[in-house]
Amino acid sequence: MKWLGIALVLLFAVSACGKQGNVVPNVAVNFILQLNDPRYTSLRSIGSAVTVDNYGVAGIIVANTVNGYVAYDRCSAYEPEKRCAVTIDDNKLLVTDPCSGSKWLLQDGTPNKAPAVRSLKAYIVYIDASRNYLTVSN
């Protein structure tokens, strides 16, 4: 009976580990966005968001929210192995995974519509107001 208990605990532990699996991979991110650059001047306004290609796993989204600047990897947190890049909704409040239909809030990266259950991968945003630029890194 003791061995049965140990076997059940081990079986549960092994199967639970498999469910933790799919997360957005860690990649080095470190770049500067000049807010004077015409591609990014909209970020001066609260409620704006832009995409930046060639960084992160599937690109980066940078947004100016009521709580400040945020940055997320565009790689969907739902089935990230598919590398589906989320897109910014017209209202600039949500992003959508075109592969699954999942949605996340830009404000904090939390899931807003199933099947997503994990938040978007966030990056750190440093603001240098005197030089008018943002640094995004991890």
Say what each PLM segment does.
Residues S76, T96-D97:
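Short cysteine-rich clusters marking metal-coordination/redox-active sites
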Residues G18-N91, L105-L106, S119-N138:
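N-terminal pre-ligand scaffold of iron-sulfur
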Residues N112-K113:
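Acidic, glycine-rich flexible loop segments
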Residues M1-C17:
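Sec-dependent bacterial lipoprotein signal peptides
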